[in-house]
C-alpha cells in the first residue's frame, strides 16, 4: 500500500484492524532527500512530509482505539536529526522533529489507557536512505549503525515490563564520520 495515498491507506488499515488483533503499530517508513534546501523541489518536500510525518499520524489515528482496547504500543522510528541541526537535510530533519514531537504529546494523551509510545532515534545507518545524497556513511564499522542494531533497540524498549515505558532511545555509532560518494 502506498502510505502517501490516504484513502488507500485508511482502507487497508480498516481491513487489517478487522481481521487481526493489532497490538503494535510500527511507523518505520521513511524517505530523505538531501542537499541545500533551496535546491529541493516541492514534490520532494511533500513526499518527505507525507511519508515521514503525515502517514504515521494517520496510521496512529486510525488504530488508536484498537491500541487503547488492546493496551498496545506505537513504535516510531524517527532520527537523531529530530533534535539537532541538519544542514543539507533540514526538511528531512523537520519531518523527524515533527514525528518525535507528535510521539511525546501522544504518549501523554494515551498513557492513562495503558498505551505505550516509543520513539527510536537512530543516527546514520547502513541503509538505502542516503541513496539520493552526495554523501554516505564512513567506511569503518564504528561510523554507522546496522539496521539490526536499531531493531535491537526497539526490541529492548518493547520488552519492558507492563507499567514501564522507555519513551525514547537515541542510538549512535561511536564515530561521526561521513564521506563523499
Regions found by a protein language model. Give the residues of each.
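The beta1-alpha1 cofactor-binding region of Rossmann-like NAD(H)/NADP(H)-dependent oxidoreductases
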Residues: 1-11, 42
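Conserved NAD(P)H cofactor-binding loop of Rossmann-fold oxidoreductase domains
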Residues: 28-34
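Substrate-binding pocket helix/loop in short-chain dehydrogenase/reductase
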Residues: 36-37, 44-46
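Active-site helix of classical SDR
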Residues: 60, 95
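Alpha-helical segment proximal to the catalytic Tyr-Lys
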Residues: 65, 104, 108-112
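C-terminal helical subdomain
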Residues: 119-120, 137-179
Amino acid at each position: 500500500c502506498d502510505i502517501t495515498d490516504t484513502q488507500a491507506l485508511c482502507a487497508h488499515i480498516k481491513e487489517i484492524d478487522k481481521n487481526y488483533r493489532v497490538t503494535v503499530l510500527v511507523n518505520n517508513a521513511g524517505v530523505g532527500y538531501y542537499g541545500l534546501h533551496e535546491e529541493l523541489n516541492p514534490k520532494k518536500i511533500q513526499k518527505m512530509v507525507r511519508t515521514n510525518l503525515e502517514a504515521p499520524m494517520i496510521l496512529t489515528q486510525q488504530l488508536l482505539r484498537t491500541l487503547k482496547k488492546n493496551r498496545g504500543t506505537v513504535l516510531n522510528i524517527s532520527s537523531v536529526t529530530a533534535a539537532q541541526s541538519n544542514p543539507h537535510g533540514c526538511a528531512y530533519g523537520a519531518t523527524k522533529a515533527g514525528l518525535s514531537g507528535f510521539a511525546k504529546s501522544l504518549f501523554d494523551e494515551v498513557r492513562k489507557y495503558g498505551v505505550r509510545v516509543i520513539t527510536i532515534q537512530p543516527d546514520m545507518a547502513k541503509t538505502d536512505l542516503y541513496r539520493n545524497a552526495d554523501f554516505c556513511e564512513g567506511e569503518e564499522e564504528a561510523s554507522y549503525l546496522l539496521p539490526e542494531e536499531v531493531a535491537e533497540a526497539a526490541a529492548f524498549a518493547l520488552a519492558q515490563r507492563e507499567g514501564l515505558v522507555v519513551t525514547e532511545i537515541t542510538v549512535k555509532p561511536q564515530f561521526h564520520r561521513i564521506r563523499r560518494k
